[in-house]
Amino acid sequence: LKPDATHYCELVFDVNSAYFDNHGGYEFAKQFYADAYKAAVQIVGGEQYILSAVMHADEINRAMTEALGREVYHYHLHVVYVPVVEKQILWSKRCKDKALVGTVKETVMQVSRSKKWASKPLLDDAGKPILQKNGKPVLKKSYSILQDNFFNFMRAAGYTDIERGERGSTEEHLTVTQFKVQ
């Protein structure tokens, strides 16, 4: 690994507190996040890459607590994982057998956050990339792809009333310190 490489990443699965409160609270949240963990396993490429997964109920939703006159907790799941991707090593032009040059020599697993979360080209109805005026493909942000994958997994797991986060949102991720300052 390069000295400045990212060795691990974190996914935070967060759902509106009202969703859990309307479905029974803590027990429902536990089952939901057990299923969300299965989605995380699929998203990161396997359970062997997950270092930690913890459901938190350590925050009170103040607005709902005041409105309902009882404590309503905010549940979320933190998943810490190693961002591993498959990388193909090709035979170089120094190979003695010229027929092998450019073909796959071996496939290795590589730690790479940038390759794990690369943006993907948007496709039209025919499956072809949508192009910008300069001829380059329009890219769908990797976090949008992640949200789509999570949403689709949870719908397939039976959570048919769940709603996907706002598409095209320009909201930025905040560190814990930035969030607390706000």
Question: Whereabouts are the PLM-identified features?
Answer:
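Accessible peptide chain termini
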Residues: L1-K2, F150
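Single-stranded nucleic-acid nicking/binding segments centered on His-rich, glycine/basic loops
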Residues: R62-A63, V85-Q182
